[in-house]
Each structure stands twice: as C-alpha cells, then as structure tokens.
C-alpha cells in the first residue's frame, strides 16, 4: 500500500534496479549490504545470507582518488572469460573459494593473519582478471608494507576504493603511509 514501509527484499530489488540504470551490470552486492546493514554473503541468483562477526575487525577504507567505469571493467572481464573460459573460470572459482574461507574466518573470529592473506590473494586474482590498476596495486602494497594484515580493491575496480585489515593501534600509521602513496582519503571502520 502507498505509504507502507517496504520489506527488505522489496527495497533491495528497487535499489538494484537503480544500480542497473547507473552501472549496467551491477553485482548486487552494494544494494544488498546497504539494505540489510550487516555482513552479507552474496552469490548472484541466490537469496543473500546475513552472518555475524565472531570478533571485531578493524578496516581502513581507502579512496584511491581515481574513478573508473564499472560497466567497462565488467565488459572487459566478460571478454576475457569468453576468450578463455577454462583459465578465467578457474580464477573466478579461486575467488569464490577465498570468499567462502574468509566468511568462515570472520564468523569464527579467526586468525587475522590468515584473513589478511586471503584478502591479498583475492586482490592478486582480481589483478589477473584485469580489475586492478597499477595505482591500486601500489596502495595495497603500501598498506601491507606499513603493517596491514592484507588489502584488496573493493567495488568495480581500476579505481574507487580499497579495504585494508589493520590492528586498531596501527591504523593511523597505515593511513599516513597510504596517503603518502597517493590515496585521496582513508576512513577507519570497525566491523562488529
């Protein structure tokens, strides 16, 4: 009815439609996380699963200062996959396995070192899919070199944002190193 609040599912569907107008082929992750306001395990075509964090995690969210077209990046990945389904399908499969393992670690409050290593491995695989850029790679390296457990691009790639898993007391020095390496801004985020 007009004026009645929308269910989470209905709101998620509407926000996704808006994302389609803007991006062309959005993943559906952004709208899902925003609507449900908690960690979400997302697989396209499957109802999203929210989950709990076993122990607080501290991240730096990093603005690379570079904008890039998600539509173009997705199109380029699609072309790579079409040219060599076996090779790029294997990379996508590895990313899926990393995500499943990372979810289990997050839920159990698992080892930060292992979670950080998974983030960095995920970034490397995204680079192999042409989703990263030299600037994003430099920022990930700067985060790790200054004490982050791991770092990876987030979103459409080739620009935009990255995330780095850090100890709370190291966040200021990691943020400073990132700004020195060319990050436009950083924000501290606690996931609980």
Residue ranges of predicted features:
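C-terminal nucleotide
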Residues: 2-6, 13-23, 31-152, 163-192
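Glycine-rich phosphate-binding loops that contact phosphosugars or nucleotide phosphates
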Residues: 159
């Amino acid at each position: 009815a007009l004026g009645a609040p929308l269910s989470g599912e209905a709101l998620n569907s509407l926000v996704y439609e808006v994302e389609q107008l803007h991006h062309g082929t959005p993943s559906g992750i952004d709208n899902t996380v925003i609507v449900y306001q908690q960690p979400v395990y997302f697989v396209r075509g499957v109802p999203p699963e929210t989950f709990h964090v076993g122990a607080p995690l501290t991240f730096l969210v990093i603005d690379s200062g570079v904008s890039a077209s998600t539509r173009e990046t997705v199109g380029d990945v699609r072309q790579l996959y079409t040219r060599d389904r076996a090779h790029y399908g294997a990379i996508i499969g590895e990313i899926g396995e990393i995500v499943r393992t990372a979810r289990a670690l997050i839920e159990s409050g698992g080892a930060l070192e292992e979670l950080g290593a998974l983030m960095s491995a995920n970034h490397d695989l995204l680079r192999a899919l042409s989703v990263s850029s030299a600037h994003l790679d430099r920022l990930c390296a700067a985060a790790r070199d200054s004490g982050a457990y791991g770092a990876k691009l987030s979103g459409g790639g080739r620009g935009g944002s990255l995330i780095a898993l850090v100890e709370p007391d190291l966040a200021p020095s990691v943020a400073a190193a990132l700004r020195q390496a060319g990050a436009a801004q950083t924000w501290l985020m606690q996931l609980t």
